[in-house]
């Protein structure tokens, strides 16, 4: 486990953004007559930014291999 304060900050911020995205997705699911597209799009962008920060803490080759093994994703795409 990482005890680094920077890792903790990145992990916390990513978690917050993922929860916000989940909240908007649930709202859209529960209220299909309303349009949450813009809010969902914004939250996806926020999650993407924070996820890219977290990726720096981990073995990207191992993650790429996981994607190939689990989903058959072409390594050139990763």
Model-found features: residue ranges?
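Flexible "arm" and connector segments at domain edges
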Residues: 1-78
